[in-house]
């Protein structure tokens, strides 16, 4: 095999891995599985089902992380080196905590500007996930899903996809732009304003990973952000999409 053919094969393989791990194929798979099992996405009142969201999120997380680590192993890549780098855990953890107020500030500022300049982008008056937070059990399930499928899964997923772009698909910056847009579209259910804000946050978390080569700070800040958002919803302070 010539070097050009080898490079092309690596690019196609990397593209396949990125598409499989972007989030949509695996979620569609489990949407189909849950449908075949007779598990509905909404309850009798038409509200999103917390059981459905929890099962979908956790199942997708397990499969997606399995695929990511499988693909890394196939190329004999070290997950510890890729996801944790050489920075000290304590320093990255504290940095992640310090990032959280900045993330919240960016979110609130962006939401205010978007609602003022382009009010039509707020096509979903109320975040549909707020209707799930009706009992302590629901809050616990939703928070667990937000931490595992949101904070942890999404940051490992982002790091893996940026790695593949950096290696074979035009560079990390290209990957950062493309996956940030995909990340935003994945939250379109919460409104176009939320999709734009989420894309911006994805770009920020991705940039931090590329600069520090560790997911600890992004996982901590993303997880903390999700928890704070849930608390704001519970107290009625926030009605914005996240």
Provide a role label for each language-model segment.
Residues 1-81, 90-91, 116-117, 230-242:
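N-terminal, membrane-interfacial amphipathic/helix-forming hydrophobic leader that caps
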Residues 11, 77-78, 88-93, 138-139, ...:
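Membrane-helix interface segments
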Residues 13-17, 53-54, 93-98, 139-143, ...:
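Hydrophobic alpha-helical transmembrane segments
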Residues 26-32, 177, 183-186, 193-242:
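Functionally important transmembrane alpha-helices
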Residues 37-53, 77-149, 167, 239-242:
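Juxtamembrane helix-loop-helix connectors linking adjacent transmembrane helices
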Residues 59-64, 145, 197-205:
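Hydrophobic core segments of transmembrane alpha-helices in multi-pass, intramembrane catalytic enzymes
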Residues 67-72, 103, 107, 111, ...:
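Structural signal for membrane-spanning alpha-helices in multi-pass inner-membrane proteins
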Residues 152-178, 207-214:
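Membrane-interface helix/loop boundary segments of multi-pass membrane proteins
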